[in-house]
Amino acid sequence: MMNVNVLRLDHRIGRDTRITTHVCLTSRAFGASKIYLSGEEDHKLMENVRDTADRWGGNFEIEYAKNYMGVINKWKDNGGKVVHLTMYGSQAHEIVSEVQKSSADILIVVGGAKVPGKVYKSADWNVSVTTQPHSEVSSLAVFQHLLMDGKEFDLEFENPVFEVIPTAHGKNVNIHDENR
């Protein structure tokens, strides 16, 4: 399986905290192994995401990246491919098979404020999840779902403290005290 990382552009403390947190959690839940945050360095947000990942299992990483183009360029220099999610790109459902056929690791770039043209130019694919304005969280979730062929439903996260057991009614949560 390909390695998927996410790059969140231009985080702003206070204004973007909730949406960036949701981008991080969505990345993790849908199979990414790491997220890079650019913009303002938000230690509290990063610690909250690490804490959530620790409690719910897996090896998800979060890293601050002052220079987002440095992340993109290094990714490409190491043979990786870049997918930039934008409402102006090729339709996700039409391009995802091409992305899947690539044997390269994938960096998904999710915008914040106005995305500079150099991000569009550096992307191997500019990808749209519909051609309508909506949330970067929903774009990320839909694209990762397509990229994973729905296999994110079968992901197992190692050493969780909390583990939800699917049930039609009520809540069923296993608590693994040994992982605290």
Curated annotation (Swiss-Prot):
**Broad EC category:** transferase
A GO molecular function held by the record: tRNA (cytidine(56)-2'-O)-methyltransferase activity
Report residues binding S-adenosyl-L-methionine.
L85
Matches recorded under CDD domains: aTrm56-like
Gene3D superfamilies documented for this protein:
3.40.1280.10
- EC number per UniProt: 2.1.1.206
Query: Where does it localize?
Result: Cytoplasm
- What is the annotated role of this protein in its UniProt record? Specifically catalyzes the AdoMet-dependent 2'-O-ribose methylation of cytidine at position 56 in tRNAs.
This protein's name:
tRNA (cytidine(56)-2'-O)-methyltransferase
Origin species: Methanobrevibacter smithii (strain ATCC 35061 / DSM 861 / OCM 144 / PS)
